[in-house]
Amino acid sequence: MDTRKVKSSSRDAVNCLPDEILAKILSYLPTKRAVSTSLISKRWRNLFALMIQLFESQHHLYLDDSDLVYPEEGKGEMKDVQESFGDFVDKTLTDCNTIKKLSILCPLKCCAHKDIDQWLHHAMERGVVDLDMRFKMGFTPTQNEWPCNVFTIKTLVKLTFRIEVGQNKMPYCPKGVLPVLKSLFLHAIWFACERLCHSMLPGCPILEELFLHDLRGYRYNDSPNFSISHKTLKRLTVHFNNSFELGRPMQFDTPSLLYLEYSGFAPCRYSRTSYLNSLVEVKLDVHIRHECNTHMHLSPIIDWIGNVKTLSLSPASVKMMYSRCVELHVFSNLVKLYFESNEKEGWEVLPRLLNKSPKLETLVLKGLHCASDHGVCVDRNEVKVLEIYGFSGCGREVRQVKCLLREMQFLQVMKVEIDAHDDNKKLRVINHLLDLPKRPSKFHIQFL
């Protein structure tokens, strides 16, 4: 059959569909693609508006400034493009009767305060439940220019918010009134940490998940404490950008916390961690700055991980443990350990951790090629599942695997991710692993 006839038949079949069916199809497309269909023909020009009318509660409105092509030169043209994007967002939101999920991303160019305020007003009026807004303002907003409306949308269940204001700090932290908010994600927010705890979090009475990424705040002398206090919080993620000169005192009052992920410098010795016994899983990426080491202390870190069932340690965390000769407590509840090190000294921490983890069942390793030539000796343990990532098949890796298999008498499965781009090399590594000394019949190897 002629190719042109097939294409023509396909177009005719689509065009024969009722407008309501086509609008339903558009509701499954990303907003940018759904809007672009208006260029197909006169009939398609109004289908996006029909989709908004019929399926607005099901569609995720995703609007970003890459929807428009930026001219390479000419400030006048750029201003026109920015205004055009603002008009497009404003018209799209105005055409909606209700909005459940909305994302507006303007990472490339600065947004005007009046536009942001208008978009938030539209979202608030239409009962938005899930809001994701990320933009830059190009200046430090005053209290009147800061988009406070975002923290007063009472229908919000999930809020993701990022604002870039250059190298200046936010002069204050707005009070939140978010009675049904359960998940709060803040990116690159520049205000003092204690103001977050005292001004914003009290307005989120049922908050369960708090994510603070690239948290900067004030310098050590201006804002000495990092404090999180919340009774219903279950998941907490804190990613500092390591801009602080010194370790900071940290205080946690989170009796319901189950998951903690922390990335940044080690806290100072005056930190107080209350109510962390409920923790089930902890991920640590803890750094230490040697010129400031008198201010940083590891006892708070050990307190965090004392009762967890799942623990993840980054190379920086492992380095911190061996460089400071940390005395480890018994991890009486630990059943799964993620361990990664890119230095041979770091692998000396692994036997100590295994000896302190009597209930450990799953061990996940990465960076095995950095272990010493003679391998790391471990005592017999209860591990049943061993996972190895980035295995290239070098001699020291193979020797280390043999050592682990010899002491893991209860091991049932070993999962290995082969790091080889060449298929022939990958096959050689697989055959090498399969030729290792035979184990009991219950043991088997899986390749990831």
Swiss-Prot record:
GO terms for cellular component: vacuole. Transmembrane segments: none annotated. Keywords: Leucine-rich repeat, Repeat. LRR repeats lie at residues 82-106, 185-214, 215-240, 310-341, 342-367. It comes from the Eukaryota. The keyword rRNA processing does not apply. Coiled coil: none annotated. SMART domains: FBD, FBOX. Pfam families: F-box, LRR_At5g56370. Residues 11-58 form the F-box domain. PROSITE patterns: FBOX. PANTHER family: BNAC06G06520D PROTEIN (PTHR31293:SF22), RNI-LIKE SUPERFAMILY PROTEIN (PTHR31293). This is Putative F-box/LRR-repeat protein At5g25860. It comes from Arabidopsis thaliana (Mouse-ear cress). The lineage of its organism: Eukaryota, Viridiplantae, Streptophyta, Embryophyta, Tracheophyta.
